[in-house]
Amino acid sequence: MAESLHRAFICGHPVAHSRSPVIHNFWLKQHGIEGSYERRDIAPEAFSLFIREFPRFYMGGNVTIPHKESAWRLVETRDEAAETIGAVNTLWLQDGRIMGGNTDTYGFAANLDMELAGWEKNAVATVLGAGGAALAVVHALQSRGIRDIRIVNRTVSRARAVVDRFKGGTSAHAWEAVPDLLSDTSLLVNTTSLGMHGGPEGHIDLAPLPDSAIVTDIVYVPLRTPLLASAAARGLRTVDGLGMLLHQAVPGFERWFGVRPEVTPHLREIVVADLEAGK
């Protein structure tokens, strides 16, 4: 176990694009911790072995696509968010056991808290998409007391599956319902790849949204997605997706290294610069 001191990882397949090492290694340096956070490209067929073996070399780590659901099945104990969402993105060791958690729900809410405090008051939320990211967002919204959450997906059965998982306060809708849903939406959340570099193109008419509405996108490449650009042009308040990435990293770092780091403008600048350099 001595080899594992002050080492953490992010594993995925592929994983070279991950900005998590930029975030965690910045915090390690900032807090004077002699440690490392590194990328591990683990193919799906090797993931089970990696989970069994990582405690020999690491204190814990993060899990990204395509391993989040597999990690959920393999860990010994899960936190409430991971249990509900059905996916694990953070691993740590406790009393010799491998623990799993999901910090995406925390990251989503913390990002909005920092940018637009009070966002959850009297909110009516419309969530675009019904994948894993949508599950984390809906969990965050429900945990903040929002009881009118509309899940919209091109395949309505997937939206219904989200509703079945969360029960009360959620409803499933077809994509064609978006114009009607927006008329009383106070928080619009995009969890799809719409507007992402390399993702599908598309346009959502935001004219029906109330002037007081907030529009947020979990996509952060590009930072200003077409959806956010349209919202800003209408004078609506917007929140980009980079903050979710930054904030979701906080709980894991604290568990592994014993210090709760802060998300600061300086950290954001560093990650934005890294994103720009990687274009």
From Swiss-Prot:
Give the EC number(s) listed in the UniProt record: 1.1.1.25
Question: What does the entry list as the binding residues for shikimate?
Answer: 18-20, 64, 89, 104, 220
This protein's GO CC annotations: cytosol
* Name by which UniProt lists this protein: Shikimate dehydrogenase (NADP(+))
**Source superkingdom:** Bacteria
Listed binding positions for NADP(+) are 80, 129-133, 153-158, 218, 241
Query: Which species?
Result: Chelativorans sp. (strain BNC1)
Q: What does this protein do?
A: Involved in the biosynthesis of the chorismate, which leads to the biosynthesis of aromatic amino acids. Catalyzes the reversible NADPH linked reduction of 3-dehydroshikimate (DHSA) to yield shikimate (SA).
Q: Which UniProt keywords apply?
A: Amino-acid biosynthesis, Aromatic amino acid biosynthesis, NADP, Oxidoreductase
Name the encoding gene, please.
aroE
